[in-house]
């Protein structure tokens, strides 16, 4: 796994960036104040047997600081871990704006784009 050195990174163990880039889906309430981001990491490196037990949450790091969620769930196929599903919830417009600033930095670091469906 890569050591932390990007402008924006996701970590499951502090100090170790997860190199697998997730699929991210956003949903918002009708008034736009609350919502969630669902991250799906297919075959993330953190699911290796030697690191699996060290997951305590997902940490989104950038120049402004850190966003944290503890809602991390594993998906298994035929008894083997295959993916991580992580939910980040925001409860105010300010929280959403902060998340979007992180998301834009993370996208820029990983060559990602944004599309509305």
UniProtKB/Swiss-Prot annotation:
Its main location: membrane. GO terms for biological process: photosynthesis. Part of the photosystem II complex. It is a peripheral membrane protein. Belongs to the Psb28 family. It is found in: Cellular thylakoid membrane. Keywords: Membrane, Photosynthesis, Photosystem II, Thylakoid. PANTHER family: PHOTOSYSTEM II REACTION CENTER PSB28 PROTEIN, CHLOROPLASTIC, PTHR34963. It comes from the Bacteria. One of its GO terms (cellular component) is photosystem II oxygen evolving complex. This is Photosystem II reaction center Psb28 protein. InterPro entries: Psb28_c1_sf, PSII_Psb28_class-1.
